[in-house]
C-alpha cells in the first residue's frame, strides 16, 4: 500500500497542469488579459480599440473573479475523483470580433492582408528560334570574290577590264555582263545589250587560275553617274555581273546535260585616286535545279575544306563550342553567320535567348553544318 501511494505521488509531481488556451490567431480582437506567468517572458499589448465608423455591441461580461490562486500556481493534474473538487479550471471569454486586427510582433499570429490576391508575374519566354540543317552542295567553279578588280585597259584609255582568280573542277565559260538582272533559273539578262553586249570567255579546269578580260572589250564608266554605279537599282540590276557556268555531259543519251552556275553580283565604287573598286554584294549558286545564296561563315576551320573548289569560309577561332568548350562547333547563327555552337548547346540556346553569344545580335535562325573531308562522296 505504501508503495502504491508513493507511485501515485510521483506521478502527480511529474504531471503539471497547463491550462488550455486557444491560439491567439482565432481572435480578431486582442485576447483577454491573463495574469503574467512566473517566467516573465510573455508580453501583452493593451492597445485601445477605436472603431468610430462601426456601431458594435458591448463585449460580453467577464466571468466573476475567483478566490482560487492563479493558474500558474496549480501544479497537480487530477488523477481521480478526489482531486477534481480542488482543481481550478480558468474560463476563457468567447471570441469578440470588432474589426480590429492586431499585427504586433508575435510569431503565433497570422498576418492580415487587405486587398486582392497578388498575382505572380511570369517573365515572357524567349522567342523561338528556328533550327535548320544545312545541305552540302558541290560547287564546280568558284570566283574568289576578294580578288575581283577593275584594271585599266592600256590600249583603250578610260576603259576598264575585269580581273579575278578562280578555281574550277570542270571546263566551262565565263560571261561578263554590265548592268545585268537575274531572272528565272539564274539567267542573267543585260539591260543595255546594244551598248554593252555580254562577253563570253571559255576556261579550263584547274585551281588558282587568273582571269583577265581581253583588251578592247572593256567598259567606259564615264557615261554613268556614281550613284548608278555604287548601288543596285530597285529592280535588282547590278552594275557588274560575272556568270560562271559548267556543263556536265549526261551519262546516257536520253538525259539532258547538267548545267551548274555561280553568279557574282557586284557594285563599283570610286576611290580617292580616281580608280574604281569592286564590291561584291552577292554570290548565287544554281545546282541541280536549285538556287542557293552563298554566305560566309565566321569560325570554321579552313583546313577541313582544303582541296575543294570553293570554301568561302573564314577561321576566326578554335574548334570548340563557345558555350560548353568541349564539343566541336557545328551550328551557325544567322544572320551574323557566327559558327560558334555545338548542336546540343544550340538546342538549349534557342529556347532561352535570341542573342548571338559572340556579337549579341538577334538570332533569326540556327543552321547546323556538317563539315566533311574533301574525299568523301556526296
Curated annotation (Swiss-Prot):
GO terms for molecular function: ubiquitin protein ligase activity; ubiquitin-protein transferase activity; zinc ion binding. GO terms for biological process: protein ubiquitination. Pathway: Protein modification; protein ubiquitination. Signal peptide: none annotated. Residues 1-79 are annotated as: Disordered. The keyword Transferase applies. SMART domains: RING. It catalyses: S-ubiquitinyl-[E2 ubiquitin-conjugating enzyme]-L-cysteine + [acceptor protein]-L-lysine = [E2 ubiquitin-conjugating enzyme]-L-cysteine + N(6)-ubiquitinyl-[acceptor protein]-L-lysine. Residues 1-21 have a biased composition (Basic residues). Keywords: Lipoprotein, Metal-binding, Myristate, Transferase, Ubl conjugation pathway, Zinc, Zinc-finger. Residues 29-38, 55-72 have a biased composition (Pro residues). SUPFAM superfamilies: RING/U-box. Myristoylated (in vitro). A lipid is attached at residue 2 (N-myristoyl glycine). A zinc finger (RING-type) spans 321-360. Residues 164-283 are annotated as: DAR2 domain. Acts as an E3 ubiquitin-protein ligase, or as part of E3 complex, which accepts ubiquitin from specific E2 ubiquitin-conjugating enzymes and then transfers it to substrates (in vitro). The RING-type zinc finger domain mediates binding to an E2 ubiquitin-conjugating enzyme. Belongs to the RING-type zinc finger family. LOG2 subfamily. This is Probable E3 ubiquitin-protein ligase LUL3. It comes from Arabidopsis thaliana.
Amino acid at each position: 500500500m505504501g508503495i502504491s501511494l508513493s507511485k501515485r505521488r510521483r506521478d502527480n509531481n511529474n504531471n503539471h497542469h497547463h491550462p488550455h488556451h486557444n491560439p491567439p490567431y482565432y481572435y480578431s480582437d486582442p485576447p483577454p488579459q491573463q495574469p503574467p506567468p512566473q517566467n516573465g517572458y510573455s508580453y501583452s499589448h493593451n492597445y485601445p480599440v477605436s472603431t468610430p465608423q462601426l456601431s458594435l455591441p458591448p463585449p460580453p461580461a467577464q466571468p466573476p473573479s475567483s478566490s482560487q490562486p492563479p493558474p500558474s500556481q496549480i501544479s497537480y493534474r487530477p488523477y481521480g475523483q478526489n482531486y477534481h473538487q480542488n482543481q481550478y479550471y480558468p474560463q476563457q471569454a468567447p471570441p469578440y470580433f470588432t474589426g480590429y486586427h492586431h499585427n504586433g510582433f508575435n510569431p503565433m499570429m497570422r498576418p492580415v492582408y487587405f486587398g486582392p490576391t497578388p498575382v505572380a508575374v511570369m517573365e515572357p519566354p524567349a522567342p523561338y528560334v528556328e533550327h535548320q540543317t544545312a545541305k552540302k552542295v558541290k560547287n564546280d567553279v568558284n570566283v574568289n570574290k576578294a580578288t575581283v578588280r577593275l584594271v585599266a585597259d592600256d590600249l583603250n584609255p578610260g576603259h576598264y577590264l575585269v580581273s579575278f582568280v578562280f578555281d574550277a573542277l570542270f571546263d566551262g565559260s565565263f560571261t561578263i555582263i554590265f548592268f545585268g538582272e537575274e531572272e528565272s533559273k539564274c539567267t542573267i539578262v543585260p539591260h543595255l545589250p546594244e551598248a554593252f553586249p555580254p562577253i563570253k570567255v571559255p576556261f579550263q579546269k584547274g585551281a588558282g587560275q587568273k582571269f583577265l578580260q581581253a583588251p578592247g572589250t572593256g567598259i567606259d564608266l564615264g557615261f554613268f553617274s556614281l550613284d548608278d554605279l555604287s548601288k543596285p537599282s530597285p529592280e535588282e540590276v547590278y552594275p557588274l555581273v560575272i556568270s560562271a557556268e559548267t556543263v556536265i555531259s549526261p551519262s546516257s543519251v536520253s538525259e539532258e546535260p547538267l548545267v551548274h552556275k555561280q553568279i557574282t553580283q557586284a557594285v563599283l565604287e570610286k576611290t580617292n585616286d580616281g580608280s574604281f573598286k569592286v564590291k561584291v554584294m552577292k554570290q548565287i549558286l544554281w545546282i541541280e535545279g536549285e538556287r542557293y545564296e552563298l554566305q560566309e561563315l565566321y569560325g570554321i576551320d579552313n583546313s577541313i575544306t582544303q582541296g575543294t573548289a570553293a570554301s568561302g569560309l573564314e577561321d576566326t577561332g578554335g574548334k570548340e563550342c563557345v558555350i560548353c568548350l568541349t564539343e566541336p562547333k557545328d551550328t551557325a547563327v544567322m544572320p551574323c553567320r557566327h559558327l560558334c555552337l555545338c548542336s546540343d548547346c544550340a538546342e538549349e540556346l534557342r529556347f532561352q535567348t535570341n542573342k548571338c553569344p559572340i556579337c549579341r545580335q538577334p538570332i533569326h535562325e540556327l543552321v547546323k553544318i556538317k563539315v566533311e573531308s574533301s574525299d568523301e562522296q556526296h
